[in-house]
Amino acid sequence: MDRKREPVRALELFCGIGGFAEAACEKADVVAAVDQSEIALSVYRLNRPSTPVKGFNLETVSPAVLADFNADMWWLSPPCQPYTVRGKCRDLEDSRASSLRRILSILPQVRPFSLGLENVEGFAASEARNLLVSVLKSCGYRIREISLCPTRFGVPNRRPRYYLFASLGELGEMDEAKISEYSMRDFLDGRPSPELALPPGIVERFGRGLPTLDPDDRNAYAACFASSYGKALMHSGSYLVHNGGLRRFSPDEILRFHGFPAAFKWPPKLGLRKRWHLAGNSLSVFVLRRALSILPHFK
């Protein structure tokens, strides 16, 4: 009889609302989830009350603190702004990259068995990526880098991302199976809130320049939803044709595109704009669940 493999002890750094934990499911025991955002941690606590959450600054974390978690795997979703055009592509000179630099300075002293990282595609050509790969190679890790988008797995949402997986053991092949052939309507709320509607004046003035979708178009793909969705009108995500006008996607709809479960909850007092920000800042559970199969623990 085959013995069931024990879940890997995972440390979720830059955890946000818990995308990694959702993707890893029963294959990982998240020993701690770390983030600076108390708002993100409040969402994490609500949905995973048994997971210890830690709100501290990774820029100044000590090797002993990370070592004490005794994690077999580290997962990282560090800030993406240093590697985006809107963030001025300042790379390692950006103060928001300091936390990643600190973790990489500690890595040779702690050496978890495996590590994974997700970021925007611009990270692939960054000095931060070069530093990451250099540190990993010097520590003896095997490395796999890949660019993935939800559309590759049948999800109608463009969100291309860079992924890196590293292990002191062997790396495997990714599960390439499509999730399903979804239509846009599969992700939409049954009764969307009226507050999602764009004012007629905004539609009249800017409507032609906005990425709009017909929910009945089976070939439609939603643009990447950014953390600024709901705040910035342009370059932050798509809009739906609705009742003769346009409306925004709801935070719950964005989470469905990501692959979060229907049971996922928001704190009741958390406003719409904060929900948009956190949903846009999260990752594709659909994609990560398949990408994690590269690591030996997740086969």
Name these PLM-found stretches.
Residues 9-11:
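Conserved beta-strand elements of the Class I
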Residues 13-15:
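Class I SAM-dependent methyltransferase "Motif I" SAM/SAH-binding loop
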Residues 17-28:
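Conserved SAM-binding loop of SAM-dependent methyltransferases across substrates and taxa
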Residues 30-34:
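Short beta-strand element of Class I
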Residues 37-38:
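Conserved SAM/SAH-binding beta-strand->alpha-helix loop
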Residues 42-68:
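S-adenosyl-L-methionine
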Residues 61-73, 80-231, 246-247:
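Class I S-adenosyl-L-methionine
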Residues 199-299:
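C-terminal target-recognition/interaction regions appended to catalytic cores
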